[in-house]
């Protein structure tokens, strides 16, 4: 791998834009989450995918965590429909996809439609078929058929406060090059920055050029932080605590799957497509509850030596009152009683009570944004 010019996953950055006339086509409605992923396919964030998975690729992803041709891919990107709708779309061939507002999204070139076992598929992707798992629950609620085929993007959503920070891989690669970065570390997040996260990011760029903070914007589980809160907190943190030209912020518009180890690989692939040479993989990356071993997302990278991006594995960071620094269990001999750390539940309880946590947990500027927001959490 050439760190200064990392290849997209699969060797080619996909770009699929529609230049024809879509008027008069059959139409099909898709969710906002699926509309976001269609845009991700079109822009190459999901390279090498050019559309929704066909049956051979879908089954290969479930069984092997790879596409049918052997290319690493761990999360199925699919379009579900009921039997009648799937048959109609397949018969039409080219179908105009519309989001819930009726806006044009893309043309789907439908190639096949096929059934799938939702419970078995969920067990493969999530390592469990427990309906209490948010990803499993989502898959079990899907319709019974899948439609495979390439897509071509017709139109994009209007710019919003959140979308102003969305960037395509072409844009991020240009931005990194313009900054003079040859090594770029990706930081995946679905939370506002704890000071420990900030220190972890800064540790990772001590010997690298810059960090790309890339929060997930899209559907998450109840109790997670709202998208606008996460973005505003990061903007404030970068403004006050980062040297110039060492950190860039860009939003990734997709939903959290909570697929643990498989999603860690997916996160790495997307960030490689953005042009990142490294990705931070923390404890229980993309996990939820107690479904995954805390370091399973580290070990899974052993099964994917062909990825171009390099994972940086970190245990949990915390502030130690004895060490007088931010550290981790590998470097600190002191017990839990000396550590400034807080669980997600305890942090949410504090915020709901209108109280700010210790400055060793959240920067004052970050805490203020959260406390002043009328609805910092997803209902």
UniProtKB/Swiss-Prot annotation:
| Biological process annotations from GO | hydrogen sulfide biosynthetic process; sulfate assimilation
The pathway noted for it is: Sulfur metabolism; hydrogen sulfide biosynthesis; sulfite from sulfate: step 1/3
In Pfam terms, one family for this protein is: ATP-sulfurylase
Q: Which SUPFAM superfamilies match?
A: Nucleotidylyl transferase (SSF52374), PUA domain-like (SSF88697)
Give the EC number.
2.7.7.4
Its keywords, alphabetically, are: ATP-binding, Nucleotide-binding, Nucleotidyltransferase, Transferase
CDD domains according to UniProt: ATPS (cd00517)
Reaction catalyzed: sulfate + ATP + H(+) = adenosine 5'-phosphosulfate + diphosphate
Q: Does the keyword Cell membrane apply?
A: no
UniProt-recorded Gene Ontology molecular function terms: ATP binding; sulfate adenylyltransferase (ATP) activity
Q: Tell me the superkingdom of the source.
A: Archaea
NCBIfam families in UniProt: PRK04149.1 (NF003166), sopT (TIGR00339)
Q: HAMAP family attached here?
A: Sulf_adenylyltr
State the family named in the UniProt similarity comment for this chain.
Belongs to the sulfate adenylyltransferase family.
Kindly provide the name given to this protein in its UniProt entry: Sulfate adenylyltransferase
The organism named in the record is Cenarchaeum symbiosum (strain A)
Gene field: sat
